[in-house]
C-alpha cells in the first residue's frame, strides 16, 4: 500500500529539484508535500525494520548506484532504485550464508545480513567519491558577538576543577588515609578521561571551524573506526601485544584514505566529511561483524567500543596527558588558519595562506589527537561535538578562546561521565563513553532542531 502511495507522490516530488526560493516566488508551498513524503519513507522503514530487522546503508547505496549509472529522471530512479536495493540485499544475504558456512568451525552463529550490507555500501560510496569531484562551498559561519570571553574561560575551568575534585572523592572532604587508598586507582582513569576530553574537544573545534558544519566531530573523519578495525586485526593476528600497533595502523589507514580522496578535491570540507563517514561506516560494519561472530575475543572489542576508563594504566595515562599538553601548546599556531580558511579558497590565497597545505596540516593534527584518544578510551562520541558548542554558548566566539573553553569542557564532560558511571550502578560500572553518548544524544537532537 505504501509503495503505490510513493509512486502517486512522484509527480509532486519532481518539484524538489527546484530551489525553495523559486517555488516561493511562484507561490508554491511544498511543506505539506515534504512532510507527507517523509512520513511515507518513515513508514516504509518501520515496516522493513519490524519485519526483518535493521538493514543499514541500502537506502543510501542504491540511489548512489543508480546515479552512478547515469539514470537521472525521477520516474526511472523510482523504479531502478528498489531493484538495485533488492540486488544489494540479495548479494549480502548470499554472502552471509557463504561466509557462515566457510567459517562454521570458527564462529558459533550465522552472520546477520544487516551487518554485511554496509560493507559493499561503504566501499561503493568511497569509489564514487574517488571518481567524482565535489565542488567546494566556503563554510558558512554565523558572526557571533564576543561576549566577555574571560568569564567563559573561568566558568569552564571552575567546572573542570569541581569535576576533578569530586572524581577523587564523592564528597569535598578527603582525609589523608582515604587519599592514600584512592589515589593509586583513581588518578590514571581521571587523567585519562581528562586528557581524552581535551584532545577530542580541540579536534572538534578545528573540524567545526574548518568545515563550517556545527555537527562536525572527530568521529566524522572515520579515525576512531579505523583504530577499532586495527584493534580487531591485532586481536586476530597477535593477541593483546598487537593491539597498540594495530590501532595505530588502522588510524593511519583511515587518515591516509581521507587524505588521498580529499587531495583529489583540494581538501574541500564536504569531501573530507563524506570520506570519513563512508570509511567509518565500512569499518564499523567490520567491527560489528567481529562482535556478532561469537568469537570470545570479540568481548574485548565490545568492551573497548563502550569507551571504558577503568582499565587505564599509569603509563598510558601519562602518555595521553603528554599528547594533550602538546596539543594545547601547538593549538595557537593554527589560529590564523582557523580565522582565514572559513572565508574560502580565493580569500585565503589572497591573504597569503595556502589552503591545501593548511587543511592537510590541520587534518593530520586532528587525526593524531583522535587516534590517541581512541587508543586511550575507545571511540567516545559527543565529547568532541558538545564541548565547542558549550564554549560558544558561554560567549567564546574566537578560535583561541573557544579552544581553551572547549578543552576545559571536553575534559569536564568525560571526567563527570567517568564519575557518574562509577556511582550510578555501584558496585558495577558504566563505561564513560557509553554514558557520555547517552547524555549527549538529547543534546545532539536539540542541536539538529535549532540548526538552520
Show the residue positions of the predicted features:
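Alpha-helical transmembrane segments in inner-membrane proteins
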Residues: 1-452
